[in-house]
């Protein structure tokens, strides 16, 4: 927050100062997310850099501990993307961020970095969908065709299915699909 005030005082553009102020948003599950383009960009790239850096040195949350708030950071990425109604190529950002570490001479120890980050973000997306009261079977179907490059689209599909599934039309469609569809993945696509 203070960085935004300092940058404005030093004559930086208001959008840049706002982005600096909002780079750590959202700070919790129900707090606001940045909305302006510079703010969204800085917030997401800062969080991606943080995740790549910590996962790169094998500092990951355990099932009971997350002292670096990496789960909150991942949810911040997910919420910022979804609430701004964007599909970003998160896999490309993860790759680019890890290459920047290499370019600067930092040897990231974790050889499974990309896969672990993808799994971690997928798990956080599962948590986000549960928090939005999406049915378990719809969450699993959504995750079966999931890509980090289409978080917003995946969320919209899950939300739509969740809304329709208990209507008469949804019940009828579900009955038909039980006999014709080989897997939940075919339904969600």
Task: Describe each model-derived feature in a short phrase.
Residues 179-189:
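Single conserved hydrophobic/aromatic residue that forms the stacking wall/gate
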